[in-house]
């Protein structure tokens, strides 16, 4: 009787975890909802929503580190200028080394054909 109760408890916890996990909303979906509501706000009343839209643009278009788009552009210009200076000094090398650039991280990657390749197909 006791193993049956433990098994039932295990199944109920697993089911509750799966339901909770399925209800989580991915970040991309939240951003698309924010953009669609922003578009609806522009159509309804552009004067009231312009301030919040500018704030949302700064948040969604930044580099992820809290930089505003203007700061990100300045950083890119600085990196490009450093690369041009380095390539101008090393005239014959044909390659310049970039030492700093904004980096965006990918949350997950789908890998196709991730098998080891040692297995022969079943015939």
UniProtKB/Swiss-Prot annotation:
Glycosylated residues in this chain: 63, 65, 87, 93, 114
Keyword Glycoprotein annotated: yes
This protein's UniProt keywords: Glycoprotein, Proteoglycan, Signal
Superkingdom as given in the UniProt entry: Eukaryota
Transmembrane segments: none
Region of interest: Disordered: 32-123
Region forming the signal peptide: 1-16
Annotated Basic and acidic residues bias: 38-60, 74-84
Protein's name according to its UniProt entry: Chondroitin proteoglycan 8
Organism the protein comes from: Caenorhabditis briggsae
